[in-house]
Amino acid sequence: MDWTKQIVRYVVVMMLQVLLFDQLQLWGACHPYIYILCLLMLPITLPRSADLLIGAAVGLIMDIFCNSLGIHMASCILIMFLRPYILNAIVSDTDRLNEQICLRAIGMGGFIKYIGLLVVIHHLTVFMIAAWSWSHLWFVLMETVVSSIITILAIIGYNSLKYR
């Protein structure tokens, strides 16, 4: 794996998130967080501690730029903790994945399940912590659904273009 290429790609995705997607307020309830693409596409051969540290670092960077007091960090650590379990539940033979998780490696159905579950968990965590109240539950659920759909479509589009 070419780490320089990966790092440049992740910096570009993070910059797009901060400069473009964070400024985008679609319908007041859509907040696409494409930066989690960086986490979901990490090689599966990384040690578990590295996964969690990278998740914490990416979340911290987003918290700094979004002024969100640890919300993204908590959400990123959670999805990085759950990632291997979800991947093992979806893909029966993780040995065939080599190093990279991509559309081509696990097929469209598996890829959508993998991305979909982790994106929904991330978004639900972000919006629940931000609301910090059960009184806003319906708005949080609406925000989660709309934002997750847009984020999932963006990640699938990116992955389709990348591995064409």
Regions found by a protein language model. Give the residues of each.
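Terminal, non-globular segments
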Residues: M1-R164
